[in-house]
């Protein structure tokens, strides 16, 4: 009896081990349905729930909140990424070439700085960015440069012929101005210069008098934060507004073209207008929301979810409150733009999530109604029609009565 019980225990234990091993190899690849026959939860679980108590600062009409485009990758549509320094654009740029689920993925080969991102139906690029076409319009080209340069560059790369003109969808990332400024300082401190940037505007580059250098020598490595802040020509100041505005409106880099206060006002309003007109923009501080809005805007899906890394080089810089206030003053236009952009970003996210929830509730309701109607059909089919008494049968009953 003891021997038989021992064999039984061994069989059960062996079966359990076999099932465990089988699950380890096959389990991750299995698609198991949710209980009750319901579909598994969608990717909405990846994204933060909108704050129901969020207070809007600015009014935006629905047309500014709705961003569902019919991006035609097989047609003539092109995504143009405006990469502002130290906004997380390098990471986002890699997402575009390595992490988007595509019919024909970008060809990224080890050791090469650029990937080949062809359309599914022809050898022509659908993405204009650092990691696909390189710095074809200059290092970190701004809105003024890109809008005047991109069409010509692509026409030379891929002659249009008789086809319809291309449609360009501009995208960018913004970042908290203080964090971005500190990050740029640390980058310059390590030897970065971006001195090969063209700053092309109205067909010419700025003169040395219009854009004097902040340092002598090959770079500004080792500069202190105070030295970085003291240079009045430092392009780090209000960089995001300058790179998003139409510089032609203010005489490009000629500071004597219009009064300083008027110039600042025109730059800020132009940057806001161009930001609203872009197909998409994200915020470095909200990675998952940025992923969500990009996917819903272009109807493209990322393979792996975005990660929020808050421990950046700027995050490790300890500065006092007076220094932070000074940085905010130097970047006053960027502070105003970011406040505006953050509110628009949050409203777009809230609007789209609410819209999707409403559509999901309608789909669920339609599915329930359809399910109930299908359940009712078999009972109706199996019911036999009642027998109608014949005239002879009724006469027979009456006679007996």
Curated annotation (Swiss-Prot):
Substrate binds at residues 113-114, 130, 135, 140, 187, 194. The keyword Coiled coil does not apply. InterPro entries: Heparan_SO4-6-sulfoTrfase, P-loop_NTPase, Sulfotransferase. Its main location: membrane. Optimum pH is 6.3. It is a single-pass type II membrane protein. It catalyses: alpha-D-glucosaminyl-[heparan sulfate](n) + 3'-phosphoadenylyl sulfate = 6-sulfo-alpha-D-glucosaminyl-[heparan sulfate](n) + adenosine 3',5'-bisphosphate + H(+). GO terms for biological process: neuron development. Gene3D superfamilies: P-loop containing nucleotide triphosphate hydrolases (3.40.50.300). It is an enzyme of class 2 (transferase). 6-O-sulfation enzyme which catalyzes the transfer of sulfate from 3'-phosphoadenosine 5'-phosphosulfate (PAPS) to position 6 of the N-sulfoglucosamine residue (GlcNS) of heparan sulfate. Also transfers sulfate to CDSNS-heparin and performs the crucial step modification in the biosynthesis of anticoagulant heparan sulfate (HSact). Critical for normal neuronal development where it may play a role in neuron branching. May also play a role in limb development. May prefer iduronic acid. This is Heparan-sulfate 6-O-sulfotransferase 1. It comes from Cricetulus griseus. The lineage of its organism: Eukaryota, Metazoa, Chordata, Craniata, Vertebrata.
